[in-house]
Amino acid sequence: MSMQDPIADMLTRIRNGQAANKVAVTMPSSKLKVAIANVLKEEGYIEDFKIEGDTKPVLELELKYFQGKAVVESIQRVSRPGLRIYKRKDELPKVMAGLGIAVVSTSKGVMTDRAARQAGLGGEIICYVA
């Protein structure tokens, strides 16, 4: 059976892994998942990530905890295969009044809402992380 929304699966694995206090979670790798993982690492939501395997690459994310609590309080899919959500640069949302991030896929790559606003770019809102 094929997976309908691999990004939602990635976010669910992160959410479930942190709920179970796992050190790391693994999932099938793709360019978009690696780009999202890179944004999460730059923003301090995960410790690190690595890609293993050649024929079927596997993405492994090291989850991050602070004083025993998960750093990611909430992670929510916004744009999905059945309903894509696109926003212009002036319409980009501020998650939790700027405390969280929106991961945006732009013409210049995957970045946070703050970086997209600075670059003057809009794009597809992939998810919210707080």
From Swiss-Prot:
Gene giving rise to this polypeptide: rpsH
InterPro entries: Ribosomal_uS8, Ribosomal_uS8_CS, Ribosomal_uS8_sf
Organism for this UniProt entry: Pectobacterium carotovorum subsp. carotovorum (strain PC1)
Matches recorded under Gene3D superfamilies: 3.30.1370.30, 3.30.1490.10
Subunit and interaction comment: Part of the 30S ribosomal subunit. Contacts proteins S5 and S12.
Keyword set includes RNA-binding: yes
Family: Belongs to the universal ribosomal protein uS8 family.
PANTHER family registered for this protein in UniProt: 40S RIBOSOMAL PROTEIN S15A (PTHR11758)
Alphabetically ordered keywords of this record: Ribonucleoprotein, Ribosomal protein, RNA-binding, rRNA-binding
HAMAP family assigned: Ribosomal_uS8_B
Record's signal peptide: none
Protein name according to UniProt: Small ribosomal subunit protein uS8
Molecular function GO terms recorded: rRNA binding; structural constituent of ribosome
Function: One of the primary rRNA binding proteins, it binds directly to 16S rRNA central domain where it helps coordinate assembly of the platform of the 30S subunit.
Gene Ontology BP term (one): translation
GO annotations of cellular component type: ribonucleoprotein complex; ribosome
